[in-house]
Amino acid sequence: MLTMLMVVIVMTSTLFPFIVGKYVFFRIVVDLALIFFLLGLLFDDRHSSAIYRHLSALYKNPLVIAVSAFVGIFLLAGFFGVDPHFSFWSNFERGEGGIQMLHFYIFFMLILSLFREEKDWRELFWWALGGGVLMGIYGLLAGGGMQGFVGARFSDPGFRFQGSIGNPAYVAIYVLFTSFYALYLLATEYKKKLTSSGALAIFGSLAFFAVIFLFAATRGAFIGLIAAVVVALGYLGFTNKKWRKKLSISVGIVVVIVGILIAFQGSLVVQKIPGSRIFDITTTAKTFQDRAIMWKIAWNGFLDRPALGWGPENYLNIFDADFNTAYFKPAEGFGAWFDRAHSIVFDYLAETGILGFLAYISMFISLLYIFWKSRKREDGPTQFQRSLFIGIIVAYLIQGLVLFDVSVTYINLFTVLAFATYKFQIPSTKKQINTNG
C-alpha cells in the first residue's frame, strides 16, 4: 500500500528532488515487503504451500507470462547492450534501468500473490487516491511559494502544474490513472451509495484531478483522454443496444467540441481558457519538431542494433553517435531532454530492440485476450468496469506516443496490469487460482 505514496516523496536536499526520493522510497518498501513475504513462506508451511500453488497458477495466465517476458527481455537487452553496467544501475538523475524494472516486477508479483479479494484492490486504490491528492496539495503549496516546497510558481510565465512530480506531462497521465481508480471505486464500492461521504470524497478528488489536469496543460495526455473517452463510450454503445444512440450522440458532441477548440485555438476566447496550450495540436510546434528529430535518431539506432537494441538507458549513446545539428538552435537552446527518445515506441525499439518492443506490445495483446476470454463469466466485471479498463489503457498508450515511461507511470501501469490479471481471470485459470487460494 505504501508504494502508492511514492509520488508524494520530494527530497529537496538532492540534485534531483522530484526523482531520487521516489525511487529510493519505492525500492526500500518493495525490498522490505519481499523480505517479509519470503520469511512468511519460510516459517509458515501451510501458507507457503498455498502461495506456491497460487504462483504456479498465475504463471499460466497469458498476461503474467507477457509481463514476465517483457521484464526478462528488458534485462537481457541491458546485458547485451553497449553499457551493461549503466543499463542495470542507471544513474542518480533517472533511477531507472534494470534494477528499477526488477523492483516493479517484484511489486507486480507481490500484489498478485497477496491481493486475493476485491477489498484488497479497493484499499490499494484508496491509497493511490490519497497519494494523488497529496501530490496535488504539494503543487498548490509550491505554486503559492510556501517555504520548503520546490516547483513551479503560479506567477511563473507559462505556468504549468507540476505537483510533487516535477513534470507537467507526468502529472497529467498520473491523474488519469488515479481517476481510473476513483471511477472504479464509484462503480463498485459506492454504486448504490453515491451520496455517502466516501462517494462525495471521491467526486471531490475527481474534480481536483480535473483542475490539475487542465493546468498541467499536456497535449499528449489531452489527446489520450479524448481518445479514451471516445473508445470507452464506443465500447459501451457496442455492447449495450439500449444506450447505443445516446452514447453515439455523446461521442459526437465530444468530438465536435474538441474539434472546434482545436480549430480556433488561436482565438482570444480559447486562449483565455486555463491550459489552452493543449488545443495547439500542430506538427509545427517546437516540441513536436524536437521529438521528430529524436525519433529519427532512435530509428537509426534501432536499425544498427535491431534484435535487442542498445540497452536500457543507452539512448544518449545513440543521440551522440547520430547527432543532428538541427536539434540545437542557438537562439532557442536545445529541446526536450536528450537521454530519451520521448516515445514509448522509439525508446523501446532503440533500447530493447524488436524483441523488447514486441514483448512490450504483447502485454497489451495478452490483456485484450483475457479481456475477451472472460467476457462470458457471470461473476466477471460489468461492461462499465470493462470500459474503464479500455479507457485507461488507450489513454496511456496514446500519450506514450510522445512520452517515455518513468517510475510514476510504471507503478500505475503494473498496478493496472496486475488488477486486470485478477479481474479478467479466464475460467480455467480462475478455477485453479481459487482452488489454490
Regions found by a protein language model. Name each.
Residues 16-17, 86-91, 214-219, 400-407:
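Membrane-interface helix caps and helix-loop-helix hairpins in membrane proteins
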